């Protein structure tokens, strides 16, 4: 009687298993990954070089699972709105992945393509060089923060009974918790676009 067949393993299966672990626990490890797929740890290295490659595969997966519409770079404000929303929505579907993504360089061509679209839109607006890099860094921070905000508890600020009157007045008008994140994102997106417009005019 022959040996039982080894479980099939692929890069796609590894990526899916790693994403499931991150969604559930906030991280992944090779022992947990091997156990989930039902293979030995050593067999994983036949398909990926290590943790960094898996992280880039995860980045590729979440950015490409719902592709954004092509943008007209010349209409830079509309283009930025599409791109920033797509970036935020990608991480909003997997908010626990966001902290892991800031730990290494971005190399995936499809993800780099999103940043190329950002750079082209900013260039069309009139920005150059260092200002484009600074604008992209600002957008990056905002989009990742907005995605993490969607994973926040329903009650983010719970001030003590005494004091803090200004915050309490603001919170009384903040609306249902489920709407807070979306409203904050739309507000922040308007602020970023207005700020970029003002920067160009200065």
Regions found by a protein language model. Give the residues of each.
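Hydrophobic alpha-helical connector segments
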Residues: 67-110, 139
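Alpha-helical structural segments
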Residues: 12-20, 36, 53-71, 78, ...
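Basic, helix-initiating cap at the start of DNA-binding domains
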Residues: 1-32, 48-56
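Append "Primarily bacterial transcriptional regulators
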Residues: 33-36, 44
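Residues in the recognition helix of alpha-helical DNA-binding motifs
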Residues: 47-48, 135
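Regular secondary-structure segments
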Residues: 15, 19-23, 63, 88, ...
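Hydrophobic alpha-helical bundle segments that form small-molecule/ligand-binding pockets
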Residues: 114-161, 196-199
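C-terminal peripheral helix-coil segments that are non-catalytic and often amphipathic
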Residues: 155-202
